[in-house]
UniProtKB/Swiss-Prot annotation:
The gene is cdhB2. Belongs to the CdhB family. It comes from Methanosarcina acetivorans (strain ATCC 35395 / DSM 2834 / JCM 12185 / C2A). Part of a complex that catalyzes the reversible cleavage of acetyl-CoA, allowing growth on acetate as sole source of carbon and energy. The alpha-epsilon subcomponent functions as a carbon monoxide dehydrogenase. The precise role of the epsilon subunit is unclear; it may have a stabilizing role within the alpha(2)epsilon(2) component and/or be involved in electron transfer to FAD during a potential FAD-mediated CO oxidation. Keywords: Methanogenesis. This is Acetyl-CoA decarbonylase/synthase complex subunit epsilon 2.
């Protein structure tokens, strides 16, 4: 079992409230209990190992995917509901309770973020943290302090193992 709750060194400081570290099992429970979760993936998800795990998470939990950056081509031909959106626009839209969502069924209550550059996603989640009730679960390789919950800083192998544990727990 990978301990994803350690090594939470802050590389930047955006505020006084930082995310709580989480385990793959707890993250899986929160994802399963979410009413309207959205898997938000970044360009780093084009790593074949990470892409495979993102697809498995979306399929197993029946979660739509918001493909940001240049990640959309990775989901073409996969059996997932993926739509492209600019990450900064998504961060703006999810703070609006009247936003219809990517599917027209309303806004999302939980964002699961994976495959982003840490300083970029931290800025986007700063807005959602401070201006909405949306929860953000960072299952990234790096600790994301503006998420509601986050894995700690992990090696690549530990990150893959943690994602496998999360998939098994969904």
């Amino acid at each position: 079992m990978v301990d994803t709750t350690k090594n939470t060194k802050l590389f930047t400081s955006y505020g006084v409230t930082t995310s709580k570290t989480t385990t793959p099992e707890i993250a899986a429970k929160l994802i399963s209990k979410a009413k309207r979760p959205l898997l938000v993936v970044g360009t780093k998800v084009l790593d074949p190992e990470l892409l495979d795990r993102a697809v498995k998470i979306a399929q197993k939990a029946n979660i739509p995917i918001a493909a940001t950056g240049s990640s959309m081509p990775g989901f073409v031909g996969k059996d997932v509901d993926a739509k492209y959106i600019n990450l900064h626009q998504l961060g703006f839209y999810v703070t609006d309770p009247n936003w219809p969502g990517l599917d027209g069924n309303g806004t999302y209550d939980t964002l699961i973020v994976l495959g982003h550059i840490k300083y970029y996603i931290n800025q986007v989640l700063s807005g959602t943290k401070n201006f909405s009730t949306v929860k953000a679960i960072a299952i990234e390789r790096n600790y994301i302090q503006n998420a509601t919950m986050s894995f700690g800083n992990l090696s690549k192998a530990d990150h893959y193992a943690a994602l496998d544990e999360l998939i098994d727990a969904l």
